[in-house]
């Protein structure tokens, strides 16, 4: 008798959902509503926490011009506040302009910024709750989640924030799928291109790496997962980028192919 995986670890883009959902729906929505969201929620603790993380990330920025631009804007606004006694709202407006410019710069380059992903997640939350967004999933996803969850754990690992992941499956085109999902992981766990990230996930789900099946549409993510000891499957969905014929991973076109 063949024993199946104890954990089904899944990517989102190109695996559970079409790649186009993120690039053509979610990203444009976050970009369109970024400024309004920041201005409406600037003083909230979550936004300030993201801003603090953004500043820390910026200090490690490899593009020196962006480091200087963002850091100088932030420093100047604080100095102006202290020297002239300008009210908090005026200072916030100055800082928001700097933050928006840097966030748009990150978006344009598809940077995997944890602070950006967190902000995007909350913007999307507003969209889902307003009925303006729907988490599109492939037709085979719901059945597979229900089937797998009866004998194993279903977990998600995406570069999008955990909050954003939960929204996709809570407001999915197949209904609320969150009851079938045991755990969510994002870049706070580590880069998807690092074997250490998959070992960390194995510890958190309390399963040996060899009992975890990771499914993704990207070979550069599957390789480190396999190096960590995980089983792998390459998701080949409509709209995905072409993959090399000799990639070393078993290919699937539907979750129905996996027991």
Residue ranges: model-predicted function:
Residues 22-104:
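Conserved phosphoryl-transfer catalytic core
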Residues 3-22:
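Asp-based phosphoryl-transfer active-site loop
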Residues 1-3, 179-259:
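Asp-based, Mg2+/Mn2+-dependent phosphohydrolase catalytic module
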Residues 16-20, 163-166, 223, 241-242:
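Short catalytic/ligand-binding loop motif for oxyanion handling, primarily in non-cytosolic enzymes
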Residues 118-122, 130-172:
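Substrate-recognition element of Asp-dependent hydrolases with the DxDx(T/V) motif
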Residues 10, 157-160, 187, 215-217:
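Short His-Asn-centered micro-motif
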Residues 110, 114-120:
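Phosphate/adenylate-binding glycine loop and adjacent helical scaffold
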Residues 1-5, 72, 84-89, 256-259:
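Basic/polar N-terminal segments that are highly enriched at the extreme N-terminus
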């Amino acid at each position: 008798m063949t024993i199946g995986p104890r954990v089904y670890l899944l990517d989102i883009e190109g695996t559970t959902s079409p790649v186009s959902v993120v690039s053509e729906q979610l990203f444009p929505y976050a970009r369109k509503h970024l400024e309004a969201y920041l201005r409406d929620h600037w003083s909230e603790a979550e936004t300030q926490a993201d801003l603090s993380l953004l500043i820390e990330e910026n200090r490690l920025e490899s593009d020196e011009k962006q480091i200087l631009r963002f850091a100088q804007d932030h420093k100047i606004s604080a100095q102006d506040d202290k020297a002239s006694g300008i009210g908090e709202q005026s200072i916030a407006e100055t800082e928001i302009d700097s933050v928006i410019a840097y966030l748009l710069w990150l978006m344009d380059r598809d940077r995997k910024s944890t602070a950006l992903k967190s902000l995007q997640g909350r913007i999307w939350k507003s969209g889902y709750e307003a009925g303006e967004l729907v988490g599109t999933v492939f037709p085979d996803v719901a059945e597979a989640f229900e089937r797998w969850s009866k004998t194993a754990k279903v977990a998600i690992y995406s570069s999008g924030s955990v909050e954003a992941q939960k929204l996709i499956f809570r407001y999915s085109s197949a209904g609320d799928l969150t009851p079938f999902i045991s755990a969510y992981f994002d870049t706070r766990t580590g880069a998807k291109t690092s074997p250490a990230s998959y070992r960390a996930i194995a510890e958190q789900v309390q399963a040996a790496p060899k009992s975890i099946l990771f499914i993704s549409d990207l070979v550069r993510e599957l390789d480190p997962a396999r190096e960590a000891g995980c089983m792998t499957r390459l998701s080949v969905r409509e709209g995905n980028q072409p993959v090399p014929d000799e990639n070393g991973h078993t290919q699937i076109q539907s979750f129905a192919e996996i027991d």
